[in-house]
Amino acid sequence: MERHIRYDAASRSLILLDQRYLPTREEDFVCRNTDDIVTALQVMVVRGAPAIGVTAAWGCVLAAYETAESGMETWRPVLDGLIERIANARPTAVNLRWAVERMRAAWHSLGRADLATLITYWTNEAKRIHRDDIAINRRMGEHGAELIDDGDAVMTHCNAGALATAGYGTALGVIRGAVEAGKNITVIANETRPFLQGARLTAFELHEDGIPVTVACDNACGLLMKRGMVQKVVVGADRIAANGDAANKIGTYSVALLAREHGIPFYVAAPLSTIDRETPDGDHIPIENRTPTEVTHVGATQITPDGVPVFNFAFDVTPAHLIAGIVTEMGVLRAPYRESIAEAFRKAGL
């Protein structure tokens, strides 16, 4: 599944599969300018840290075209402001800022080049980011597959699959890698309230691929583990701190605690671009607080009384000591994570 992020050069637009409507309807959301990109990111037309990064890279290309169409001679500060808007669209997923800063660095490497030259260069850079993400996910899948045994039931939370990346997936990349290695496994997809990424998106992806998947209520995790129905847990991440603390979709921390209680290995799968070496630990990761209507309503139906406040934190942080390993394109990192993360970046030349 790699059709969900598509750049159309002829129309100078980014075409996104609108994930808000899956699995019952497949509808495209077309981005033609910065406003469209920011909206797509904020309302979660596209979500998942790597996919957010790829979208941001293409968003920079659209911002450059938008700047060119304005005809302003002093275009550099205008363009810089547009791409900064993209970088600030969502606070937790570090790949968003990473992608924009990579595009900005490419811009600076050109010196005083004109806007037409920058557009060409940025288009090629966005293609590289897009292509590289798929290749990185496949490498992670190969490394992570070694952690999965034949016959395992693997639990996952939220959606860290092809839809959350440029293709193949991080946590689901590990699952796909295990299946491609000939292992007979099943998947338990937690529904993942309130946006239901597990029930809607993970189940959709795996069912399309013919990988056995069962959706579970979030609050059934403990029972399933106690009954021996879960052998491994693999999740993605939106930001990993330098010490290995990992921010992922709200509820992940609870799953990790339950896994520790029941002696079940809990793994995080994420590319090096999701690791923020400038963030020392999880206490310094910003946690997005989203609109209350995601909790108070299911679709158009209100389920809570008027006037009752809600908590809608989009992410929580799983401390490093609960994580058995972090699957990256450089291999599976083990504790102590501060050292293994630093070594992985050294090996990658970053």
Swiss-Prot record:
UniProt superkingdom: Bacteria
UniProt keyword annotation of Magnesium present: no
Keyword Membrane annotated: no
Molecular functions per Gene Ontology: S-methyl-5-thioribose-1-phosphate isomerase activity
Reaction(s) this enzyme catalyzes, per UniProt: 5-(methylsulfanyl)-alpha-D-ribose 1-phosphate = 5-(methylsulfanyl)-D-ribulose 1-phosphate
Residues binding substrate: R47, G48, A49, R90, Q197, N248, K249
Pathway linked to the protein: Amino-acid biosynthesis; L-methionine biosynthesis via salvage pathway; L-methionine from S-methyl-5-thio-alpha-D-ribose 1-phosphate: step 1/6
Keywords, ordered alphabetically: Amino-acid biosynthesis, Isomerase, Methionine biosynthesis
Residue numbers annotated as active site: D238 (proton donor)
Positions marked as site (Transition state stabilizer): C158
A biological process from GO: L-methionine salvage from methylthioadenosine
EC number(s) given by UniProt: 5.3.1.23
Top-level EC class as recorded in UniProt: isomerase
Described function: Catalyzes the interconversion of methylthioribose-1-phosphate (MTR-1-P) into methylthioribulose-1-phosphate (MTRu-1-P).
Family under the similarity heading: Belongs to the eIF-2B alpha/beta/delta subunits family. MtnA subfamily.
Protein name per UniProt: Methylthioribose-1-phosphate isomerase
UniProt lineage: Bacteria, Pseudomonadati, Thermodesulfobacteriota, Desulfovibrionia, Desulfovibrionales
